[in-house]
Amino acid sequence: MPLGTLGAHGARNRYLEAILVTATSTLRVIQEAQVPLDRDIFLRSLLRELAGTLEDVVGLKDAAGYISVVGQRIGDQINNEYRSALQTPVLSREQVAEVLVDLKRRIQGDFYVVTQDEDKIVFRNRACPFGGMVSNRPSMCMMTSNVFGAIAAENLGYAKVELQETIAQGAAECMVVVHLKQTPQSEAVTGREYFQNWHK
């Protein structure tokens, strides 16, 4: 092979090697970039934008209704999982309260029971599972309402979930009251009602 040809091949190889090194270096820089993105953040962002779009297009009330359907189904699934894990066909009131706290803990919420009796369970929450994504997206609170309502009603017969305070609307903590009986007090508050087996 002529020397000129060898020189051309050598130059071409060095050029390709330089491109490869540059591409590898660029890829490393991109992979190590401090971009606040992972699967959890992506999914929470997706839910936030979906909720926001629904609120803008159909209004807050209807958006909450659509999200309620999703929350109801998730609530049923979670209820079945806990019943199976605890090997019981039905949860007691105390178990319902602990299950609701535990399920929120598992998704990085920080709910705790303030008080409970035969009429209601009162919860507070210091951290929303959706994080900052829930800000100004009150329809996303329907996930909590429906999951809590579905589990409470399926095990105890009835529930009315009252969202007294929510982080979504600017409160420092959430306050959620799950009414377990239809009383004058529960009928006087704004909330969503849930009944055992109503959707089956």
Role assignments for model-derived ranges:
Residues 2-122, 127-143, 153-200:
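N-terminal accessory segment detector
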